[in-house]
From Swiss-Prot:
Name of protein: Small ribosomal subunit protein uS19
Gene3D superfamilies linked: 30s Ribosomal Protein S19, Chain A
Keyword Ribonucleoprotein: yes
InterPro entries: Ribosomal_uS19, Ribosomal_uS19_bac-type, Ribosomal_uS19_CS, Ribosomal_uS19_SF
UniProt GO MF annotations: rRNA binding; structural constituent of ribosome
Keyword field: Ribonucleoprotein, Ribosomal protein, RNA-binding, rRNA-binding
Family: Belongs to the universal ribosomal protein uS19 family.
NCBIfam families: rpsS_bact (TIGR01050)
Length: 92
């Protein structure tokens, strides 16, 4: 179920503060955030966020296509190594 329209998008307050500070400073550095649940807003376009995946910060360059998505969608938490090969089939 999607979020109610009347509530508006959810963004942690510290993410907004960090984004505003980065915009004002003009420096293009990675903004480290831990809030995977925050929604990407239009004012974040052009900024680079380091989204934490449980081990490290994954750099995410925000584009216009990402608006409305969550930061967590661009920072995978699990590594897929593929299915294990069938040992019986290898012996033949």
């Amino acid at each position: 179920m999607t979020r109610s329209v009347w509530k508006g998008p959810f963004v942690d307050a510290y993410v907004l503060k960090k984004a505003e500070a980065a915009r004002d400073s003009g420096r293009n550095e990675v903004i480290k955030i831990w809030s995977r649940r925050s929604t990407i807003l239009p004012q974040f376009v052009g900024l680079t966020f380091g989204v934490y995946n449980g081990q490290k910060h994954i750099p995410v360059n925000v584009t216009e296509d990402m608006i409305g998505q969550k930061f967590g969608e661009y920072s995978p938490t699990r590594t897929y190594y593929g299915h294990a090969a069938d040992k019986k089939a290898k012996r033949k």
